[in-house]
UniProtKB/Swiss-Prot annotation:
This is Probable protein phosphatase 2C 65. Mn(2+) 2 binds at residues 83, 282, 328. Belongs to the PP2C family. SMART domains: PP2Cc (SM00332). It comes from Arabidopsis thaliana (Mouse-ear cress).
Length: 382
C-alpha cells in the first residue's frame, strides 16, 4: 500500500460485493464499449490472465484492467494495475483504473477520425514518432486525472493516492508507463528456460535522482529506525505521511514537496523470444523475485490460470516469509505476446531491459538496476 500514516476524510470499477475478497478463479467480468473495445476487469482471454486478491490489511486497494481492441484496433491492447494507499486509496485506484484507459482510448479514436492515422511503416524514425505521440497522450492524461483529483474529485486525496503501471501493445511495439512502485517484468526465452527482464524501475525515494528532486522541493526523505531499508517521503515540518513511493496520483499533501505524477514512459520492440509481460502490484514483488515470478508464469500449462497461480504463490510466501506481518493486496495481469508453445522448466537468469526509446519527460536515469540509497540520507532515530 505504501503509506505510513495518513489523514482521511468517472466510473468506479467494482470487483465484488465484499470489496476485495476476490481472486482470479472467479467469474469473468467483461463489458463492451460502444466503439468496439472489450474491457476486462477479471478473468482471462487468449491474450491475458488476470487475478486479484485482498490482503490482510483491510479493504482491497488494488485494481486492474485490460482493454482489447484498444483504440478500435484489433491488434492493440492496454493493460494496467493500480495500487491505492491511504484512507481513500481503494476509491482512487479504481477511479484511475477506469478513467485513464477510457480517455486514452477516446483520444486515439478521435485522432483517427480526424485523419491522423497511426504510422505503420517499419522505419525506426516513424516508430519513434508513434512512441513520442503516444507518450504525449499518456503524460497529458496522467496529469489531467491527477489535477482533477485535487480540484473536483468526490474523494479526499490529500493523503491518499495510487500507483499505476500500464502497458500498451500495438503489433510488435510495447509502450510502458510507470508511476510508483508497481512493476512490469518481461519473460523472455533463453534456450530451454526463461530469463526475467525488469521493464520498469521502482520509483521510490531511495532512487537517488528521485530523492534529489524531493529534497530540492523541501520535502524530506528518511527511513524509520524500525524499517531501516524503507525510505519514505515526509512533509517539511511534519512526520507525515511517510509515503514509500516518489511518484503517485493524489497525495496532494506532498505535491509541493517533490512528489510528481509524471510517469516514466518508454518503448520496447517485442522480439521472437519475448513471451509475456507480468504487471503486478507490490504485494507480489515484496515476497517474490522477478525470476520466481517469471518461472511461476512460464511453468503454467494452462495460461488462463497463470495470474491466479502467481497470486496463490505470493499468498503462501507471505505466510511463510513474514508470519508476523499482514499480507498486502495483490493484483496481477499477465499479457501474452504470442501464441507459440514455450519451455516449462529451467533456470531463470536476470537481465536488464534494452530500451528502444525512453521518455524525454522523466528525470530518472536508473533504468533496470536495483536502486541504491541516496548519498546523504539517513535513518530517522525516534
Amino acid at each position: 500500500m505504501g503509506v505510513c500514516c495518513s489523514k482521511g476524510t468517472g466510473i468506479i470499477v467494482e470487483h465484488g460485493a465484499d470489496d476485495g475478497n476476490e481472486c482470479g478463479d472467479g467469474e469473468a467480468e467483461v463489458r463492451d464499449t460502444n466503439d468496439g473495445a472489450v474491457v476486462r476487469t477479471r478473468g482471462s482471454s487468449k491474450h491475458v490472465s488476470m487475478s486479484i486478491k485482498q490482503g490482510k490489511k483491510g479493504i482491497n486497494q488494488d485494481a486492474m484492467t485490460v482493454w482489447e481492441n484498444f483504440g478500435g484496433e484489433e491488434d492493440t491492447i492496454f493493460c494496467g494495475v493500480f495500487d491505492g494507499h491511504g484512507p481513500m486509496g481503494h476509491k482512487i485506484s479504481r477511479h484511475v483504473c477506469e478513467n485513464l484507459p477510457s480517455r486514452v482510448h477516446s483520444k486515439i479514436r478521435s485522432s483517427k477520425s480526424a485523419g491522423d492515422e497511426n504510422i505503420e511503416n517499419n522505419s525506426s524514425q516513424s516508430q519513434e514518432e508513434l512512441f513520442r505521440e503516444f507518450e504525449d497522450i499518456l503524460v497529458t492524461f496522467f496529469k489531467q486525472i491527477d489535477s482533477e483529483l485535487g480540484l473536483d474529485s468526490p474523494y479526499d486525496s490529500f493523503c491518499s493516492g495510487t500507483t499505476a503501471v500500464t502497458v500498451f501493445k500495438q503489433a510488435d511495439c510495447l509502450v510502458i508507463a510507470n508511476l510508483g512502485h508497481s512493476r512490469a517484468v518481461l519473460g523472455t526465452r533463453s534456450k530451454n528456460s526463461f530469463k526475467a527482464v525488469q521493464l520498469t524501475v521502482d520509483l521510490k525515494p531511495c532512487v537517488q535522482r528521485e530523492a534529489e528532486r524531493i529534497v530540492s522541493c523541501k520535502g524530506r526523505v528518511f527511513a524509520m529506525e524500525e524499517e531501516p531499508d524503507v525510505y519514505r517521503v515526509w512533509m517539511p515540518d511534519d512526520d507525515c505521511p511517510g509515503l514509500a513511493m516518489s511518484r503517485a496520483f493524489g497525495d496532494f499533501c506532498l505535491k509541493d514537496y517533490g512528489l510528481v505524477c509524471i510517469p516514466d514512459v518508454f518503448c520496447r520492440k517485442v522480439s521472437r523470444e519475448d513471451e509475456f509481460v507480468v504487471l503486478a502490484t507490490d504485494g507480489i514483488w515484496d515476497v517474490l523475485s522477478n525470476e520466481e515470478v517469471v518461472k511461476v508464469v512460464g511453468s503454467c500449462k494452462d495460461r488462463s490460470v497463470a495470474a491466479e497461480m502467481l497470486v496463490q504463490r505470493a499468498a503462501r510466501t507471505w505466510r511463510t516469509k513474514f508470519p508476523a506481518s499482514k499480507a498486502d493486496d495483490c493484483a496481477v495481469v499477465v499479457l501474452y505476446l504470442n501464441h507459440r508453445p514455450y519451455p516449462r522448466e529451467g533456470n531463470v537468469s536476470r537481465a536488464i531491459s534494452t530500451i528502444s526509446w525512453r521518455s524525454n519527460k522523466s528525470n530518472n536515469e536508473c533504468y533496470g538496476a536495483a536502486p541504491l540509497s541516496p548519498l546523504g540520507l539517513s535513518q530517522r532515530v525516534s
